[in-house]
């Protein structure tokens, strides 16, 4: 069902009435990319996913092979769209995925106001330089993940990743 629109005097509110797709942590996902190749991800503790440094020209369902690859990034993903991501299997999450995921937030008005936090509840104020290399707290749409994976595999910058980097000045 498409989003429903409600109009007010000065603005438009879009209410998404679709239900999210919920994947069990440990699920493996095959992600079709725009060039016809495939990337692979793993559902972590919701809402986080991890994406492997693994790309194939034909679909692969070998969970051992996929799980042996290094992780490119861990991000929050909103699984809402009717896309062609395929659930290809499940297994318990390995020890490497029990480590907290560390991210940052940065105030839009005062770039010096940063917070580093993790998925187990730790949080502290930080200088912008301390946030370099961390993921900004953001929820990605599936199409954005597809673009980011393909850009990474093609060795080119991703517009969303660049836009979300910490501001240093």
Question: What are these model-predicted stretches?
Answer:
Residues 2-3:
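Intrinsically disordered, low-complexity segments enriched in serine/proline and basic residues
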Residues 7-48:
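Short N-terminal edge-element motif at the start of the domain
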Residues 19, 56, 168-169:
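Intrinsically disordered, charged low-complexity linkers and terminal tails
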Residues 36-38, 48, 56, 80-82, ...:
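Generic "edge-of-domain/loop-turn" microfeature
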Residues 41, 51, 83-85:
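Short acidic, gly/pro-rich beta-turn/loop elements at beta-sheet edges
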Residues 46-63, 76-77:
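Basic/aromatic-rich interaction segments and small domains that mediate binding to polyanionic partners
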Residues 64-73:
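Acidic, Ser/Thr-rich peripheral helices and adjacent loops at domain boundaries
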Residues 75-169:
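Beta-strand-rich cores of mature extracytoplasmic or soluble domains
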